[in-house]
Amino acid sequence: AYQTNDATKVEEGSFPTDKVDGWDFAGKDYSGEDDVPLPDGDPLDRSGYGHGTHVAGIVAGVGVTKKGRPYDGDYFAGLDYSEFLLGPGVAPKAKLFALKIFGDKALNSTNLVLDALEWCADPNADNDFADRMDVVNLSLGSTLGLEEKHEAEAEVFTNLTRLGSVVVSGAGNSNNNNFYLVAAPGVEHSVIAVGSAKLDGTVYRMAAHSARGPSSPYSLLKPEITAPGELIQSARMGTGTGGAWFNGTSLAVPHVSGAAALAKQAHPGWSATE
């Protein structure tokens, strides 16, 4: 069914679901250069890639049993992970809103990030922010982030945080031989930058691909936290119940986003900074 999907339209009854909603800000042919974005209601991951699908599974995947079926049992009782082909995400009961800002031609422009962030603050554009996103996961970024280069984005991130949204982004994959490199938008004050950790024996250490900070030029203590980001198994696009293994800070970010969603559930009155 996935292989025959027409990404330019949403088939009746297929989307949105109780679990997943979203929007495509770019359209299939948008490259970020001379093309005009053609938004539509289907944020399906681009064919042959699967980055967004993998990230979504880490945040809120329900898990796949050995019988090849989505898990629909109790997550609070002790789970026997040996009975899973694909383990559940960090916050498996969370609802996902997939916002697609890249076309299928290339991933070389973040021109539509601001549009997506404004949507996160007010999804139905009615000037009532009560329906804002609780957590904004940004598994993207440029290699070198400079605070003063991104003033418009910084203001939006600050406003989202004031509204109560937790914004999480990757520190970047600039490797541990380079310091003073943190990817934008993780470089911003109000964004939680996540580094990538790997299991080394019985201890988690910073993964070789992960940026280590601090930020440039103000030497902010970034990243603020690390999370698993090497040899991470999650949902594989187009398979229904299959998995794939990816590396990168993009996979560390949803671990923190999922934890933030659980914190929001347990403490709905907490501010984003709390």
Which residue stretches match the model-derived regions?
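Active-site core segment of subtilase-fold serine proteases
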Residues: A1-I58, V62-S82, G89-V90, N127-R132
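Active-site-adjacent substrate-recognition loops and nearby beta-strands
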Residues: N5, G68, L79-Y81, V113, ...
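Loop/turn elements at helix/coil->beta-strand transitions in domains of secreted/extracellular proteins
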Residues: D18, P92-F97, F129-V136, R162-V167, ...
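The feature captures the short pre-catalytic strand/loop hairpin that immediately precedes
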Residues: G27-R46, D200-M206, G229-P254
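Hydrolase catalytic cores
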Residues: A56-V59, F97-G103, G229-E274
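Sec-exported extracytoplasmic/periplasmic mature domains
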Residues: A60-V64, E118-A125, T158-R162, G172, ...
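C-terminal subdomain of the subtilisin-like protease fold in secreted/lumenal serine endopeptidases
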Residues: D74-L86, M133-N137, I225, Q265-E274
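Short acidic, glycine-rich surface-loop motifs adjacent to enzyme active sites
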Residues: L96, G103, C120-E147, G170-A171
